[in-house]
Curated annotation (Swiss-Prot):
Gene3D superfamilies: Glucose-6-phosphate isomerase like protein, domain 1 (3.40.50.10490), Helix hairpin bin (1.10.287.610). It comes from Bifidobacterium longum subsp. infantis (strain ATCC 15697 / DSM 20088 / JCM 1222 / NCTC 11817 / S12). The gene is rpsB. It comes from the Bacteria. Residues 255-275 have a biased composition (Low complexity). InterPro entries: Ribosomal_uS2, Ribosomal_uS2_bac/mit/plastid, Ribosomal_uS2_CS, Ribosomal_uS2_flav_dom_sf. PANTHER family: 30S RIBOSOMAL PROTEIN S2 PROKARYOTIC AND ORGANELLAR, SMALL RIBOSOMAL SUBUNIT PROTEIN US2M. The keyword Secreted does not apply. Residues 229-281 are annotated as: Disordered. This is Small ribosomal subunit protein uS2.
């Protein structure tokens, strides 16, 4: 179960939706009320959906699956990159390139090209046999590829699941995932269609603190799944054949489980208590 409280969510401003005129009627079931022309999300229902998404991601990773973290909007880029890196999962925080999943073979070739360029010493003009201009162009190519594909450089196959921030922004990523039958967990605001993803999390997808909170939580689910996976390997006697990576050992020793809290908040609190102002549109 996810380690998150109602207070955490309120402080992060996750209850603020979009302006009422911009809502998607399919989000009605997750909306508590409206205040000053802004829809207020029912965080009790959000908690239920968070638990479902958390358990799904944990189970997926425990069964040797990978989760691709996706969030290219400015508010999400840092959280997506940091949290995915923390649990050694692939991510896309810059522009989603068409075919990243559906044309994975071609994308893999570009990743291999990136790795080749990273082996070069761009300061060694004499040893390379290239001119300074040629080396400069190759270095620029490397930087461009790293920006586009650096987050998926170690993704050797299409992911088992995807976590997305803002499905209205990442429509192409969600479409490609569905074409390949990849389940999607996503933060879904009041202007989006929750039916387009398997595990919608009704919440504000614009507040930086909210995005950081939920992305960190999904990364925690990955970490828990990795620990469960390593425990299963030991039980099956596979530990000697498949030794744990250094970063997995670090998770075991340094990742202290957060204490669960069953804090309850009245709906009135969900309408008023927050540290962030509603979205200006």
């Amino acid at each position: 179960m996810a380690q998150i409280t109602m207070s955490d969510m309120l402080k992060a401003g996750l209850h603020f939706g979009h302006q009422t005129r911009r809502w998607n009627p399919k989000m009605k079931q997750f909306i508590l009320t409206q205040r000053n022309g802004i829809h207020i999300i029912n965080l009790f229902k959000s908690l239920d959906m968070i638990d479902k998404a958390y358990d799904f991601i944990k189970t997926t990773v425990a069964h040797n699956g990978t989760v691709l973290f996706v969030g290219t909007k400015k508010q999400a880029q840092e959280a997506i990159a940091n949290q995915a890196t923390r649990v050694n999962m692939p991510y896309v925080s810059e522009r989603w390139l068409g075919g990243m999943l559906t044309n994975f073979q071609t994308v893999s070739k570009r990743v291999n090209r990136l790795k080749e360029l990273e082996e070069m010493d761009f300061t060694d003009v004499h040893g390379s046999g290239l001119t300074k201009k040629e080396l400069l162009l190759l270095e620029r190519e490397k930087d461009k590829l790293n920006k586009q594909l650096g987050g998926i450089r170690n993704m050797n196959r299409t992911p088992s699941a995807m976590f997305v921030v803002d499905i209205t922004k990442e429509t192409l990523a969600v479409e490609e995932a569905h074409k390949l039958g990849i389940p999607v967990v996503a933060i879904v605001d009041t202007n989006a269609d929750p039916d387009t993803v398997e595990y919608p999390i009704p919440a504000n997808d614009d507040a930086i603190r909210g995005i950081e909170l939920l992305t960190s939580l999904m990364a925690d689910a990955v970490a828990e799944g990795l620990l469960e996976r390593s425990g299963a390997n030991k039980t099956e006697g596979e530990a000697a054949e498949q030794p744990m990576a250094a970063w997995e050992k670090e998770l075991l020793t340094n990742e202290a489980p957060a204490e669960a809290s069953a804090e309850a908040a009245a709906p009135a609190a969900a309408e008023g208590e927050t540290a962030e102002a509603p979205k200006a549109e």
